[in-house]
Design a protein with these regions (language model features):
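Sec-dependent bacterial lipoprotein signal peptides
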Residues: 1-20
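Short aromatic-glycine-enriched beta-strand elements
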Residues: 38-49
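Disulfide-stabilized netrin-like
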Residues: 56-79
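Short nucleic-acid-contacting surface segments enriched for D/E, G, S/T with interspersed K/R
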Residues: 72-93
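Short, charged beta-turn/beta-strand-edge "cap" motif at the junction between a beta-strand
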Residues: 96-102
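Short peripheral tails and domain-boundary helices/loops at the edges of structured domains
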Residues: 109-124
Length: 124
């Protein structure tokens, strides 16, 4: 009987510890890299998921190409965005609420939506 209680305790501790070490990911959205502009001036649109409308531009027109995008935002986290993603690529992301890293980004201009969101690309 003591062995059973001991083994049950070990099992419960193992399960509890596993839950404590799991990273909690926020809501995951599907996005598309619409414009891969110069110097990380990237425009992304939300194509799946119910994102807070106050975080994105309902409709935004690129003044260079005159193309209009819906649910668009500018990349707010250029330091950790994968260089392997190209314009037109779809990917999953969550809003990154951690402290943003500082990195060198050139100052060349390319138009982006006024609203910026720091995101983290996630594998789904």
């Amino acid at each position: 009987m003591k062995l059973f209680i001991f083994l049950a305790s070990i099992f419960l501790l193992t399960i509890s510890a596993e839950n404590c070490t799991k990273k909690k990911t926020g809501t995951v959205y599907k996005g598309r890299l619409e414009v891969k502009g110069l110097c990380m001036n990237y425009t992304i649109s939300v194509i799946e998921g119910n994102i807070d409308p106050s975080l994105v531009e309902a409709s935004w027109t690129d003044e260079t190409t005159k193309k209009t995008y819906t649910n668009a935002f500018g990349l707010g986290s250029p330091c950790n965005f994968p260089a392997t993603l190209n314009a037109g690529d779809e990917f999953y992301f969550s809003i990154d609420t951690t402290k943003q890293e500082n990195c060198a980004v050139c100052m060349a201009y390319y138009p982006t939506p006024g609203k910026k969101i720091p995101i983290k690309v996630v594998v789904k």
